A protein has these predicted regions:
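Conserved acyl-donor/pantetheine-binding loop and adjacent beta-alpha core of acyl/acetyltransferases
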Residues: 65-66, 73-105
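Conserved active-site alpha-helix within GNAT-family acetyltransferase domains
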Residues: 147-165
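Conserved beta-strand segments that form the floor/walls of ligand-binding pockets within enzyme
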Residues: 71, 106, 111
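Conserved acetyl-CoA-binding loop-helix of GNAT-fold acetyltransferases
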Residues: 109-112, 118-135, 140, 154-158
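Acyl-donor-binding surface of acyltransferase catalytic domains
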Residues: 1-59
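Conserved beta-strand-loop-alpha-helix junction that forms the acyl-donor binding cleft
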Residues: 143-152, 171-174
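Extracellular-facing segments of soluble proteins and assemblies that are Gly/Ser/Thr-biased and enriched
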Residues: 51-77
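Conserved catalytic-core motifs of GNAT/GCN5-like acyltransferases
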Residues: 18-23, 162-176
């Protein structure tokens, strides 16, 4: 009862909000491996559109210019996909939610097929795609994760990523632009 009242009061005062944790993986911290995971491969727009699993195929629009996509297959069947954005595409589409410097990219989306959830597919894909991005010269990778999505936190943390910030956007009094507040959580950018 009190929780619902508090939520209503917060919405009245702050308007719509977003709350994301920012995760970071530096190239030096990327998991070292002599052998890449053979089940994680780069994938392009055409490959994504051809996927049989609609939960994965419907995210094909995330691929393209300034995007690097990877697909994890389990027993020969695509189980998860992820997309890193950088450059102009990231700046244009994300409203610079988290600023990126050169040689930095943001993991914009990761999707796991419902049949593969709870089996470590996301963790494997996050870890291996980060390793491959680092090997390709990307120095720092970021991702934003909704504040209450515990399964995503766990996947990133098991993959070796560190939570570095909390970003809140609030829109008090229905302003034209929301206020964005960034709180560091113990690691410099």
């Amino acid at each position: 009862m009190w929780t619902q009242a508090l939520k209503r009061a917060a919405r009245l005062l702050c308007g719509d909000y977003t709350a994301y944790y920012i995760y970071r993986q530096a190239a030096a911290a990327a998991p070292a491996s002599d052998r890449p995971d053979p089940d994680v491969l780069p994938i392009d727009s055409q490959g994504l559109a051809a996927l049989v699993d609609p939960h994965l195929a419907e995210h094909a629009a995330y691929a393209g210019v300034d995007s690097t996509a990877f697909c994890l297959s389990v027993a020969g069947t695509p189980a998860a996909v992820c997309f890193f954005w950088a450059g102009e595409r990231y700046r244009r589409h994300s409203q610079a939610f988290w600023p990126l410097a050169p040689a930095q990219a943001n993991l914009m989306q990761i999707v796991t097929s419902p049949r593969a959830r709870g089996q470590g597919a996301a963790t494997r894909l996050i870890a291996e795609s980060a390793r491959r991005m680092s090997a390709a010269g990307w120095q720092v990778l970021y991702a934003r994760v909704w504040h209450s999505h515990v399964a995503s936190w766990m996947a990133f943390e098991r993959a070796g990523w560190r939570r570095v910030a909390l970003v809140l956007e609030i829109n008090p009094w229905r302003r034209k632009s929301p206020w964005r507040l960034r709180f560091a959580l113990g690691l410099d950018r």
